[in-house]
Amino acid sequence: MAMGLLTEVCAVAATPIMLAKGSKAGVYVAYDGLKSSGNYIDNACLTFDGTKWNSENVLQWKDNYTSAAFLAYYPYNENVKNAKALPFTVKTDQSTKEAYVASDFLYGNSWSHPVGGFPKPVLHHGMTNIVVNVKAGDGFSEDELKQGNLGVHVKNVYMQANVNLENGEVNASGSIGSIKAYATNALSFSAIVVPQEIRKVTVVWNNVEYDLGFSKYCERGRLYTLTVTLKKTSGGISVTIGGWEDSGEDFGGTVN
């Protein structure tokens, strides 16, 4: 019996992640718990046609009565060697929507039976979403901020991750770098980051960098909002940082 796959994505976002036609995802099927490799189906490639997912090869149930675990992830990586340590790297320059969306990692699983219809895994976000809102303080107007080539960078962060598809655990790894955030509007910026402790955000205005130091551990699948206020003082421009807002919810949109 052939099997199909339907997915949906959880839930709230600064910029909803919508999968485009032609997007590719990977899927594993395991009958006795997920193994690093050697599962019933290992890393089959599925392509999204705008409505549903299709495979080049027909995916078959082992039989007509045994339930199986379905584990899916996006984007597809043909070189995966270990389903419990799947490598993923976020983009350093997320200033374009294409690069921003490409930095999102989705994963999910479901337990299905041959007579129960299509497996329907819910895809969760493996990365963390950091939103920085910039406010005009004393001596500034919003128009002045907007005209100053405003930008935001998340600095000194791990760019790579290893994801365990069985439980969604994410371990930061690799080199340290800086992420240029995506401007969702003139005064709001969003970056997708590997889950880790964030210690530094830089606001750029009129080609001058203003560094903000702090410490906040950002968990996978959560959106954090940070408000930064620029104000003019007798000594120049000062930058103050407000508290983080943890939505406690997955960020994302709906695949339809």
Predicted regions and their residues:
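Short, low-hydrophobicity acidic/polar segments
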Residues: 1-146, 180-189, 195-197, 205, ...
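Generic alpha-helix signal with a bias toward terminal, lower-confidence helices
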Residues: 31, 133-135, 144, 164-166, ...
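Short acidic, gly/pro-rich beta-turn/loop elements at beta-sheet edges
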Residues: 82, 142-143, 162, 213, ...
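Surface-exposed beta-strand edges and their flanking turn/coil or helix-capping segments
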Residues: 85-86, 165-168, 204, 225-227, ...
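Generic secondary-structure microfeatures
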Residues: 134-138, 156, 240
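Contiguous ligand/interfacial binding patches
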Residues: 147-196, 202-222
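Hydrophilic extracytoplasmic domains
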Residues: 207-256
